[in-house]
């Protein structure tokens, strides 16, 4: 008797792998994708099985194929060539340790994108937070806090929203040939934690709803209760969907007996408000409790579409309900970017999938692979029998609560398996991803497919404007970037694949369609503005701009952004508004990023101007906060770390002013021969590219220079009245004072010079008849195109012929001329290029860092010793890590949170704990060997400021 494995029977077929049994059955026409059977089984068994997620801060977290680890990646600009790519994997070792070998099944980011929840197969949840970099995530809640119980497996999960109002944009509509954007303030949807801490709601397989929440001391606590079920068989849940609404948390559950239950749950806190400034321990912290308001039970769900009229089923395939199993359950909210508020009610979306392999009773050719079933959630009044009207008391009827109604909508059939449903672009688009890698965008209200040709005069989203994901390799898990410009897919091997959205930009069939091009630019503008208003990472938008738009199209986009965000570039009058303007740093960062080529190539002028203004803004805000934190009563002692940062920025600000002055002296000498020929002067000015000249002409950067001078005066005057200092604080403040005392340009002289420039610019505007309505145009020309507008040519002549010569008598020009400004990174000379290749400057502290190779140890002054003219140096350990900005590629030497409370408050107020001066996020990197320079580094001149003398460039952070 032959063995069962003989005669051509493949052992792999017994385990569901594709192949032929050679038993007379015709093989399937299309072999299933590797891993798809396991993925479908996983989606049927449990609702929480998301293996990859992209946070709003830009961090991609995914579970490895073995289910034991979590890795993180992120978008980054590569310093070597300026290309935007996906970073290398960084394993989160605390996750593996926390779950003790239990398979990881689900992960989810919170609304802000800073905290990550990870659940394992036993329902144990651990929580992590992005601390100082995208790949530096610290544990906050250990999984060991939860019991090891199969019934506690998570089938639904939702983070509580943050109680904050954000700026939103409804749409872009073309009015008289120009796009008009619809900004409004969007209020958050509760429930909220009264302390604005994190909260996580979970539904377990056994029908328990849990709330994990943080107390004011950042420790985690938990409450739980059972959902109201109609019977014991309903308590075994497979899926749950949760969403925050105005009336509480809406919960939809699906049980093993295929019943759909709907709950409305409120979270009540006692006390309802908590003020950490007034409540002192042992005052009670807010404690939550659950309250169930409504319950709705839907009977056994069928997927044939019984809601249709008999004639509607004609031509549709015939199949039975028993073939299908629920693989996805979601609650879809109306679009969030709606100035009128949420006018429509939520939808419940369920995906039912057929078995992957055909059976004799149910051939696969006769049934679709997936059926998307939808219900509209309506609220109706309770209708009583007329006899109740005869009852004298109407008290009971007056207090009756409205009932929930589920109205079934038209089903959607597909011959492909839907593996993911995501509501993206702030609720304006529903993206359905199929197993072959295709992504289809739908209107959430009507489920109509976006094709990008319906209306080129109104733009609500990227998908509606014609952006799409081209067909690529298949995958089993999908996550979209914060602004849906990119997506990351996990393939069958568990490898991440980056996918980018594309658009024709009006180039079709060799012709140019201006309407489609304009709509595409407006859609990208809308995505960028929504991200800025919601504090969402916008690196995915920059990635598309860099890869797909020409230089001319990028300029068009920048102009649209300035108009959409209503950024008035004219600050000749209202300069105080400049410091608190939330959109200006984002616009400047965008321009700087678009002009970045690589770490060693100078930026183009339209990129170098905003980059320099970002540095000026950083110093201005630093000085403002420095005085704010040290004028309380009683006055707090100055913090050494804060003073060190002030010292570095003071030296940078002074040297920047020297650099500007030196360049203007050279320009004045160059244009001196054309003093009597205005036409020749104008023509030469058109061909002249000077960053210092543009910086002085722009009212925005000129205002920041004035703020810096005000801050330097305050620091110099405050030295005499400062509280007694000791240790490093005394050393740093003394050096700040000496640096200002020995400056070749006095602060009052430079302020007088700025006043002269300001007068020349005002006079030029006044002479040309430019009022407040006309001035933003030339100011924007300075910022966006780095060109001197015709109206300011006379101002340049006045500055070079009168203002600059008046400054010469009040400065030490020899010292300024002999200075080496290569460390500023602004010039295009050979010395600056060599400095870029051999050294880094801490972008926050403005302190030059030592060059560290991967296995070198740099000699340093002993700890506590002070160089001749520099701050104390610390020994550098081997293989020291640093932080690099993923957007501008600049470096920070701090790889740990600030040590002191004052320093932490300062960095947090500046918004630099997790992000760079440009707004890009930090990533931890290993030290790299410096790029070789053609010649040895040029020694510093004798006129340098203290930190740039003695041992070259002082200070490592």
From Swiss-Prot:
Record keywords, A-Z: Activator, Nucleus, Transcription, Transcription regulation
InterPro entries named in the record: Mediator_Med16, Mediator_Med16_C, Mediator_Med16_N, WD40_repeat_dom_sf
One GO biological process term: positive regulation of DNA-templated transcription
Subcellular locations according to the entry: Nucleus
Region: Disordered, residue numbers: 855-883
Pfam families, sorted: Med16_C, Med16_N
Main localization category: nucleus
GO cellular component: mediator complex
Quaternary structure and interacting proteins, as annotated: Component of the Mediator complex.
Function, as annotated: Component of the Mediator complex, a coactivator involved in the regulated transcription of nearly all RNA polymerase II-dependent genes. Mediator functions as a bridge to convey information from gene-specific regulatory proteins to the basal RNA polymerase II transcription machinery. Mediator is recruited to promoters by direct interactions with regulatory proteins and serves as a scaffold for the assembly of a functional preinitiation complex with RNA polymerase II and the general transcription factors.
Protein family: Belongs to the Mediator complex subunit 16 family.
PANTHER family for the chain: MEDIATOR OF RNA POLYMERASE II TRANSCRIPTION SUBUNIT 16 (PTHR13224:SF6), THYROID HORMONE RECEPTOR-ASSOCIATED PROTEIN-RELATED (PTHR13224)
Protein name per the record: Mediator of RNA polymerase II transcription subunit 16
Protein species of origin: Aspergillus clavatus (strain ATCC 1007 / CBS 513.65 / DSM 816 / NCTC 3887 / NRRL 1 / QM 1276 / 107)
Gene giving rise to this polypeptide: sin4
């Amino acid at each position: 008797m032959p063995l069962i494995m003989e005669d051509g029977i493949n052992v792999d077929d017994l385990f569901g792998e594709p192949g032929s049994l050679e038993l007379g059955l015709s093989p399937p026409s299309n072999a299933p994708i590797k891993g798809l059977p396991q993925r479908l089984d996983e989606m049927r068994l449990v609702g929480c099985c998301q293996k990859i997620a992209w946070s709003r801060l830009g961090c991609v977290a995914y579970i490895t194929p073995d289910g034991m680890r979590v890795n993180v990646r992120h978008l980054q600009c590569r310093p070597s060539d300026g290309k935007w790519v996906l970073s290398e994997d960084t394993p989160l070792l605390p996750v593996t340790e926390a779950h003790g070998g239990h398979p990881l099944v689900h992960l989810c980011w919170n609304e802000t994108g800073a905290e990550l929840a990870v659940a394992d197969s036993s329902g144990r949840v651990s929580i992590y937070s992005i601390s100082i970099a995208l790949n530096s995530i610290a544990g906050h809640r250990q999984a060991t806090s939860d019991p090891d119980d199969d019934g506690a497996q998570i089938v639904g999960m939702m983070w509580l929203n943050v109680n904050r109002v954000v700026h939103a944009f409804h749409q872009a509509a073309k009015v008289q040939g120009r796009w008009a954007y619809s900004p409004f303030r969007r209020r958050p949807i509760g429930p909220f934690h009264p302390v604005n801490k994190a909260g996580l709601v979970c539904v377990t397989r056994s029908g328990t709803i849990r709330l994990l929440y943080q107390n004011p001391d950042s420790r985690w606590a938990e409450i739980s209760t059972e959902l109201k079920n109609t019977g014991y068989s309903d308590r075994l849940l497979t899926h749950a969907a949760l969403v925050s609404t105005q009336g509480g948390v809406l919960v939809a559950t699906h049980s093993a007996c295929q019943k759909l239950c709907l709950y409305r749950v409120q979270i009540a806190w006692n006390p309802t408000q908590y003020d950490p400034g007034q409540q002192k321990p042992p005052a009670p912290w807010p404690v939550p409790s659950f309250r169930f308001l409504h319950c709705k039970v839907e009977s056994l769900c069928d997927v044939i579409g019984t809601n249709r009229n008999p004639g509607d089923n004609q031509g549709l395939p015939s199949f039975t309900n028993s073939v299908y199993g629920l693989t996805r359950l979601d609650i879809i909210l109306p679009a969030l970017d709606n100035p009128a508020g949420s006018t429509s009610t939520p939808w419940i979306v369920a995906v039912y999938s057929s078995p992957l392999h055909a059976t004799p009773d149910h051939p696969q050719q006769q049934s679709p692979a997936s059926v998307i079933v939808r219900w509209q959630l309506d609220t109706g009044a309770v209708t009583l029998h007329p006899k109740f009207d005869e009852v004298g008391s109407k008290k009971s009827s007056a207090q009756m609560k409205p009932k929930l109604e589920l109205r079934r909508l038209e089903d959607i059939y597909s011959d492909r398996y839907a593996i993911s449903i995501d509501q993206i672009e702030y609720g304006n688009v529903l993206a359905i991803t199929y197993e072959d890698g295709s992504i289809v965008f739908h209107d959430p209200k009507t489920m109509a497919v976006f094709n990008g040709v319906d209306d080129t005069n109104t733009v609500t989203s990227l998908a509606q404007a014609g952006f799409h994901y081209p067909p690529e390799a298949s995958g089993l898990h999908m996550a979209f970037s914060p602004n849906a410009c990119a997506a990351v897919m996990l393939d069958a091997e568990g490898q991440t694949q980056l996918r980018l959205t594309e658009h024709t930009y009006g180039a079709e069939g060799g012709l140019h369609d201006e309407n489609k091009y304009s709509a595409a630019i407006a859609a990208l503008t809308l995505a960028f503005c929504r991200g800025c208003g919601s504090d969402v990472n916008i690196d995915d938008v920059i990635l598309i701009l860099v890869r797909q738009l020409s230089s001319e199209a990028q300029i068009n986009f920048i102009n649209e952004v300035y108009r959409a965000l209503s950024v008035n570039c004219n600050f000749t009058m209202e300069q105080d508004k400049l410091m608190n303007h939330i959109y200006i740093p984002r616009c400047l960062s965008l321009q700087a990023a678009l002009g970045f080529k690589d770490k060693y190539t100078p930026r183009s002028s339209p990129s170098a101007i905003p980059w320099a203004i970002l540095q000026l803004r950083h110093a201005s805000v630093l000085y403002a906060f420095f005085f704010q934190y040290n004028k309380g009563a009683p006055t707090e002692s100055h913090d050494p770390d804060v003073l060190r940062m002030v010292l570095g920025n003071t030296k940078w600000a002074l040297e920047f002013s020297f650099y500007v002055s030196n360049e203007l002296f050279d320009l004045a000498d160059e244009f001196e021969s054309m003093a009597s020929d205005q036409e020749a002067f104008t023509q030469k000015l058109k061909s002249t590219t000077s960053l210092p000249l543009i910086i002085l002409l722009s009212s925005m950067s000129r205002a920041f220079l004035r703020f810096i001078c005000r801050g330097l005066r305050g620091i110099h005057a405050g030295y005499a009245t400062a509280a007694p200092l000791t240790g490093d604080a005394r050393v740093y403040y003394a050096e700040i004072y000496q640096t200002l005392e020995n400056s070749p340009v006095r602060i009052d002289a430079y302020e007088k010079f700025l006043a002269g420039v300001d007068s020349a610019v005002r006079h030029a505007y006044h002479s040309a008849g430019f009022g407040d309505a006309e001035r933003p145009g030339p100011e924007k020309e300075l910022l966006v195109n780095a060109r001197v507008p015709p109206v300011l040519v006379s101002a340049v002549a006045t500055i070079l012929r009168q203002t600059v010569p008046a400054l010469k008598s009040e400065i030490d020009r020899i010292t300024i001329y002999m200075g080496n400004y290569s460390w500023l990174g602004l010039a295009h000379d050979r010395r600056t290029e060599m400095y870029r290749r051999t050294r880094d400057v801490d972008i926050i502290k403005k302190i030059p860092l030592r060059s560290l190779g991967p296995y070198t140890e740099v000699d340093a002054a002993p700890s506590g010793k002070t160089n001749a003219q520099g701050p104390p140096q610390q020994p550098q350990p081997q293989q020291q890590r640093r932080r690099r900005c993923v957007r501008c590629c600049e470096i920070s030497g701090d790889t740990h949170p600030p040590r002191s409370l004052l320093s932490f408050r300062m960095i947090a107020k500046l918004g630099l704990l997790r992000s760079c001066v440009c707004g890009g996020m930090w990533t931890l990197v290993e030290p790299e060997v410096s790029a070789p320079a053609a010649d040895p580094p040029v020694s510093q001149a004798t006129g340098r400021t203290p930190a740039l003398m003695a041992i070259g460039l002082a200070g490592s952070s």
